[in-house]
């Protein structure tokens, strides 16, 4: 697997290491002790292609750099493709061995089928468990382990082994839900968040700094929606009992580094800083990309 790591253009001065030179020195220093890591400089001098042995390998490096004071943006993980002698695209294939409680067998088979997995074998295991064996592209497993643990309520076990390279099996839709995107720069307020929380799950609370193009939550539907979470209520001379009621917000979902890396889509980046994790669109300007612009009352 590989991820693109690049300098964050919206730099935070309080962090110690924010330039592309700092990132380059740190990544190439890691090569001295990690023989399974590969670092490639991209044509864009701000970006580096970092390849490793899997999601965990790369996430450990990201967390270590974060704790050391580095600030950077990370793309969604991608697999390394090959081509055969005829120029046909090949992708890595793995065998997934899964032990799952009987009542969760259906949802696991459904989810892996959506990720181009092929069920090879199915049998009965001990203690009310079912043993499943899937052949699945490596990219189909990207971001799935956290979803698997949620679907099986922490009772499932999954192990994988590399099989080889096979012809490309088609596109995979990693997420069914779209993103909630801020289109105003400022500070989130309760009034704006109260209107936005009806559209899906929020990742931020009131009093947090946001900017245009920042992902502030997950939409309940498939498309991306732009919202203004910085808007305040217009004051009037008319008061009513309903207007004076306190607005109650659902507690936001705070993503860990692993959850954020799993969540981001191919058109998004994860901003990693020592103190915060922020998800953003690669193209911040909504005028150059098609989003649903929604103005809530």
Residue ranges and their predicted role:
Residues 34-42, 120-122, 155-160, 271-273:
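Flexible, glycine/charged-enriched surface loops at secondary-structure junctions
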Residues 10, 14-16, 90-100:
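Short glycine-/aliphatic-rich beta-strand segments at the starts of folded cytosolic domains
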Residues 19-30, 100-115:
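Short amphipathic alpha-helix segments
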